[in-house]
Amino acid sequence: SLGGFLKGVGKALAGVGKVVADQFGNLLQAGQ
């Protein structure tokens, strides 16, 4: 179903966003 598909996409984007945010945080800490 479309709702299930969108929920899956949302979960994937949230997972990717978390990884990117963690990496960005590490870069900021390393730059200080």
Swiss-Prot record:
Keywords on record: Amidation, Amphibian defense peptide, Antimicrobial, Secreted
One GO process term, biological-process aspect: defense response
Keyword Secreted: yes
Modified residues (Glutamine amide): 32
GO cellular component: extracellular region
Main location: secreted
Secreted listed as a keyword: yes
Location in the cell: Secreted
Function: Antimicrobial peptide.
Name of the protein in its database record: Dermatoxin-J1
